[in-house]
């Protein structure tokens, strides 16, 4: 549900309501382009209260207040654990592997994350930078990685409507990064976390940086996943928010195929060469043409021809209304 400048409310651009009650009443009586009529309110999620738990400043906490309980996964630079903070708050804890990354780079990740506040971006709670290993403490998402959720969890049975909604949530989080001149550089299902009610949050900002220049050139030697990386980024190290848009198109393909590896049967080198020649993944089985067109728009060769995350968010949020009216249009370059 979105708001108008004059205080009105809307879910689709073509119709708005003066009050929230009017909107809810309308969609309870008539789906009017939504996947189904509204029935009952969503249950309110329990959000941990984390203020006042630090001992030094707003972000630094004593590592003795963290109890690691269960290993959730392992990434390039460390492990992720489920744990408890102060004996009361369930958290996720990311630890730094010794000698795999400069401590200052890991701390810089926290400096980026603590400035980010959006419902679809993973929230930082605290850091432990005194002693080793360094901890980054974040909210804990019930279902963990979207990739595992789609392949092995309850996500194996999600509907197309849920797939579109999850894609829209990710686009919403990336719209925030876009507006604040951040890039992610590793946008993929493995770096999306899923919680109650299929709430999706973009995670792993280890490669994210504030962009002062229009283009960010990564340090030589850093590895990036070819099958998710835009050609100008993979070939020339030119990373922008528009290379994230390319990755988002690949991410949608992961969602609609329940976590299938992109470009099945092709090696990284084959993908890089084929994409540079103009090859694009074909429409996945069962994927509606309008959704595939959105994916193709993300894979335009020229970065400036790709849509913004804001336009992608709006397209996906209005997807069923537009499809019902036959009014889908490929997003215009901005």
Swiss-Prot record:
Keyword flag Transferase: yes
Gene3D superfamilies: Phosphorylase Kinase, domain 1, SH2 domain, Transferase(Phosphotransferase) domain 1
Molecular functions (GO terms): ATP binding; non-membrane spanning protein tyrosine kinase activity
CDD domains: PTKc_Src_like
Catalytic activity: L-tyrosyl-[protein] + ATP = O-phospho-L-tyrosyl-[protein] + ADP + H(+)
Binding site for ATP: 72-80, 94
Location within or outside the cell: Cytoplasm
Listed EC numbers: 2.7.10.2
Domain SH2 intervals: 1-42
Single GO cellular component term: cytoplasm
Keyword Phosphoprotein recorded: yes
Residue ranges of every copy of the Protein kinase domain listed in the record: 66-321
Major location category of this protein: cytoplasm
Active-site positions on this chain: 186
Keywords: ATP-binding, Cytoplasm, Kinase, Nucleotide-binding, Phosphoprotein, SH2 domain, Transferase, Tyrosine-protein kinase
Family recorded in the similarity comment: Belongs to the protein kinase superfamily. Tyr protein kinase family.
PANTHER family, alphabetized: TYROSINE-PROTEIN KINASE
Protein name: Tyrosine-protein kinase SRK3
Species for this entry: Spongilla lacustris (Freshwater sponge)
